[in-house]
Amino acid sequence: MKPSIILYKKLPDVLLQRLEEHFTVTQVSNLSPQTVEQHAEAFANAEGLLGSSEKVDDALLEKMPKLRATSTISVGYDNFDVDALNARKVLLMHTPTVLTETVADTLMALILATSRRVVEVAERVKAGEWTASIGPDWFGSDVHHKTLGIVGMGRIGMALAQRAHFGFNMPILYNARRQHPQAEERFNARYCDLDTLLQEADFVCLILPLTEETHHLFGAEQFAKMKSSAIFINAGRGPVVDEKALISALQKGEIHAAGLDVFEREPLPVDSPLLAMPNVVALPHIGSATHETRYNMAACAVDNLIAALQGNVDKNCVNPQVAK
């Protein structure tokens, strides 16, 4: 008899068929208490859980006593109560490798869009303001040969450094939990403390996961240390930044501009002051959102769940210790 799983994210037919070759699949649209109650028997018997963006906490796990593995279609897992999963010996699988290049592309796009004011001037053209040869009030700033500061030199940081170094001749500073000899050898990157990076970088790119240690890591103190001409980029997790402090720094001119793909609250409220600032490029968390990469992420998550329920946690497992 096939193990039962809950699927809470719509998948392409070919991936759904692959799941159904291995499991009895119950599809739901979300993990709300109402949905769990409506499908109580399926949740009670499920050994696997696959999807993205929904909160998985102890209250849900209480309803899933047979759960052995959950697989998220994402690299981040801050919506999972990892302690609760560990306590119940439930494996957590994620997709850390397949989105690297695409997210690095998004970061580079934010760097270019903010420095060259791409969104702002495009909107001015559409509004009919381009009526003569443009003057300095339309000008942006160069990207090439400017100093890039990367906070978090993981896979995505490395991919961004590659683009910046070889494509734009940018000197690279980085701050991370440990030094990265490969980054220093390949990209001539210089490891430094966070204060030095903030003071010297023309672009500060934040690529960190959300943890207890990183929550509000960037606040008023950090923005005050940046150059007034510096541009802040965040494509990691929104709550790593104190958004009120960011808004204040932009309003006071402590920093020049910001390119943001993540926010403390998502979707970003329509009355956020960030949306009224022409020097802010705000994206709807599109870091990995291409057709190709999202398919590959879903395929990876499917493979991860199959592997986990077969006892294989050699890769992409957040908590392999619970399998021992």
From Swiss-Prot:
Pfam families referenced in this protein's UniProt entry, alphabetically: 2-Hacid_dh (PF00389), 2-Hacid_dh_C (PF02826)
Protein name: Glyoxylate/hydroxypyruvate reductase B
NCBIfam families according to UniProt: PRK15409.1
Glycosyltransferase found in the keyword field: no
Gene3D superfamilies found in the cross-reference section: NAD(P)-binding Rossmann-like Domain (3.40.50.720)
GO cellular component: cytosol; plasma membrane
General function of this protein: Catalyzes the NADPH-dependent reduction of glyoxylate and hydroxypyruvate into glycolate and glycerate, respectively.
Membrane-traversing stretches: none
Disulphide linkage map: none
Organism of provenance: Escherichia fergusonii (strain ATCC 35469 / DSM 13698 / CCUG 18766 / IAM 14443 / JCM 21226 / LMG 7866 / NBRC 102419 / NCTC 12128 / CDC 0568-73)
Coiled coil ranges: none
Predominant location: cytoplasm
EC number(s) given by UniProt: 1.1.1.79, 1.1.1.81
Family stated for the protein in its record: Belongs to the D-isomer specific 2-hydroxyacid dehydrogenase family. GhrB subfamily.
UniProt keyword annotations, A-Z: Cytoplasm, NAD, NADP, Oxidoreductase
Region forming the signal peptide: none
Catalytic activity: glycolate + NADP(+) = glyoxylate + NADPH + H(+); (R)-glycerate + NAD(+) = 3-hydroxypyruvate + NADH + H(+); (R)-glycerate + NADP(+) = 3-hydroxypyruvate + NADPH + H(+)
Subcellular location per the Swiss-Prot or TrEMBL entry: Cytoplasm
Highest rank taxon of the organism: Bacteria
Xref: SUPFAM superfamilies: Formate/glycerate dehydrogenase catalytic domain-like (SSF52283), NAD(P)-binding Rossmann-fold domains (SSF51735)
